[in-house]
Amino acid sequence: MRIFSPKRYVASVDRIDLDTLWADGKRAILLDRDNTLVPRDTEQVPAALSAWLDTARAKGFKLCMVSNNWHRDQVMASARELGLEAISHAMKPAPFALKAGLKRLGATADEAVLIGDQLYTDVWSGNFAGVDTILVKPQATQDLWYTQIFRIFERRALRDLPCEE
């Protein structure tokens, strides 16, 4: 497996088929926060995403938000609102926070999938930790200046990878 290759590339989190994940033996979902669950610098959770998370819980998935965001209060507030376990200051692409999330959920890497919007943080860390990865399109067009640099390289890397709409 190539370290920067997601298993799937999907338009948004709510487009991911939970029945397929369950059939693939997945029981835990690790989720990035900014631009994956909520647009960056907002607390507004899209209704379709909230419904998807409710369905995931009802099906028996264990869920944990793993965010690089340094504003712990924002991360924890989002997690409480969404009913998720949460880890902030994740320092992805280092895999340590993902492993902590798995431990918190009582899941193995084989049972988990990581969903995120960045190739060089989320996908890299998930693959490094041995977790299947699903890349989603970012929810907002505004990024931090250093993320904008990575997005240039991401666009090149994703040129030939079809996105499941």
Residue ranges: model-predicted function:
Residues R2-L31, V38-E43, S50-K62, V66, ...:
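Asp-based, Mg2+/Mn2+-dependent phosphohydrolase catalytic module
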